[in-house]
């Protein structure tokens, strides 16, 4: 106990003096500190949430572990694959230094290259090569767009197998006269108005068809005479049959 000074009372007195000297500064600094801490926590929280959303979206589109047995799983394309897609090489097509595309093909018969022309796009030059390859090699040709040839062949197949249109049947000539010797239903009449003159028409009635034809005036006259003779015979037969019973 001897030779030692208690420090408890002195320290408490120093603290009270500091608080009395800087009361406003201490309160303001505490308030500012609280505001800064809350602002920093909000900023850090927003950044963490955004980074978490970005990571989750990337994980959804491109899973970290690739499963070759999952057909629905997508794989992020590499820079090399993207370059290959942009620089797709077509058969018989090469690019000129000024940017256009040239197409050429080798003739198997002449063993020489055939110039097909210069085109604005690589696809146009590739199509020109496909057309020339089909002419030279037929179905054995290796094409840049074989799917287009298949579509074209299917369209030609459908067009060739369409139902042919029926030609319109010719209208029969109704003025043509067909004479039927076995037909007993023949009606002859004269439109001339006079005996043995004018134009007569003969009409034949059958179960299926009715024909009409122009006949000469002589046939009309002969049929008229035949009718008069039949009429006279009818009356003569009537007179002969009624005379024995008349009583006169």
Curated annotation (Swiss-Prot):
Molecular function (Gene Ontology), one example: transcription cis-regulatory region binding
Any Gene Ontology CC annotation: nucleus
InterPro entries, A to Z: AP2/ERF_dom (IPR001471), AP2/ERF_dom_sf (IPR036955), DNA-bd_dom_sf (IPR016177), ERF_plant (IPR044808)
Residue ranges for the DNA-binding region feature of this UniProt entry: 89-146
A single GO BP: ethylene-activated signaling pathway
Region entry Disordered, spans: 1-21, 45-90, 201-248
Top-rank taxon: Eukaryota
Pfam families the UniProt entry points to: AP2 (PF00847)
UniProt feature, compositional bias: Polar residues: 45-80, 239-248
Signal sequence range: none
Tissue-wise expression: Strongly expressed in proliferating cells. Detected in root tips, stipules, shoot apex, floral tissues, young siliques and abscission zones.
Gene3D superfamilies referenced in this protein's UniProt entry, alphabetically: AP2/ERF domain (3.30.730.10)
Composition bias, Acidic residues: 10-20
Biased composition (Low complexity): 208-223
Induction description: Transiently up-regulated 6 to 15 hours after decapitation.
Subcellular location: Nucleus
Job of this protein: Transcriptional regulator of cell proliferation and axillary bud outgrowth. Involved in maintaining the structure of the shoot apical meristem as well as plastochron and phyllotaxy. Activates several genes involved in cell cycle regulation and dormancy breaking, including CYCD3-3, DPA, and BARD1. Strongly down-regulates DRM1, DRMH1, MARD1 and several genes encoding different types of cell wall-remodeling proteins.
Protein family per UniProt: Belongs to the AP2/ERF transcription factor family. ERF subfamily.
Protein name: Ethylene-responsive transcription factor ERF114
Organism of this sequence: Arabidopsis thaliana
Source lineage: Eukaryota, Viridiplantae, Streptophyta, Embryophyta, Tracheophyta
UniProt gene name: ERF114
